[in-house]
Amino acid sequence: MLAKRIIPCLDVRDGQVVKGVQFRNHEIIGDIVPLAKRYADEGADELVFYDITASSDGRVVDKSWVSRVAEVIDIPFCVAGGIRSIDDAAKILSFGADKISINSPALADPTLITRLADRFGVQCIVVGIDTWFDAETGKYHVNQYTGDESRTRVTQWETLDWVQEVQKRGAGEIVLNMMNQDGVRNGYDLEQLKKVRDVCHVPLIASGGAGTMEHFLEAFRDTDVDGALAASVFHKQIINIGELKAYLEAQGVEIRIC
């Protein structure tokens, strides 16, 4: 059995780490490099770096920040933000990223997933999915350009359909960003994760809702996700990564202890 992964996330806008609630009303958290180093030192299994407005702004993630973070960490490093071509991806990887993640650009051009997977290998290609539960229809829909609330839009894709589509096209991993739970810290959407797990045959990462150590345990134990991503509980030092991993190990979760 592969060890479960704990993954802190740096949402970056205008050169600073920010955090919102349900992808809105972002507050400034702090400087990028010190936070990245802190999480690596605490025992994170991987670090995710999202330039949250790159896609909606029509630009690519700032490569200088990628290189600065890569210099201070020694854990796998996944980068997202406006990657629209093989050339974009190659540059990000050359600046120190280990994996690239695409989200809105994949929705705009699904063939991008296959082209990137063919060029760099499926193990290098992560697809992020921003999913919103519509209480009126009882359905989960994929949203696009969520880093800028003024430009966010609902796509024609239902979440389960898109999960299956991106796998067919070569996604090596999926990060499910559950927008309703984002920043609320009331727990992951276990029901949605179970539904996605049933149709997801590549590594699946839960994102959105962690508020306690028990929430991580529930995600691993009840939905069999491969990793759990979180931001605010780590940024605000509500949970220490090392202590979280010790707790999970004590509960019988296969986890890497530094």
Swiss-Prot record:
Reactions performed catalytically: 5-[(5-phospho-1-deoxy-D-ribulos-1-ylimino)methylamino]-1-(5-phospho-beta-D-ribosyl)imidazole-4-carboxamide + L-glutamine = D-erythro-1-(imidazol-4-yl)glycerol 3-phosphate + 5-amino-1-(5-phospho-beta-D-ribosyl)imidazole-4-carboxamide + L-glutamate + H(+)
Active-site feature positions: D11, D130
UniProt keyword terms in alphabetical order: Amino-acid biosynthesis, Cytoplasm, Histidine biosynthesis, Lyase
Compartmental location: Cytoplasm
Any Pfam family the entry gives: His_biosynth
BP GO terms, sorted: L-histidine biosynthetic process
Residue stretches spanning the membrane: none
Gene Ontology CC: cytoplasm
The protein's annotated pathway: Amino-acid biosynthesis; L-histidine biosynthesis; L-histidine from 5-phospho-alpha-D-ribose 1-diphosphate: step 5/9
HAMAP family listed in its UniProt record: HisF
Subunit structure: Heterodimer of HisH and HisF.
The name this protein goes by in its record: Imidazole glycerol phosphate synthase subunit HisF
Organism lineage: Bacteria, Pseudomonadati, Pseudomonadota, Gammaproteobacteria, Enterobacterales
Gene from which the chain derives: hisF
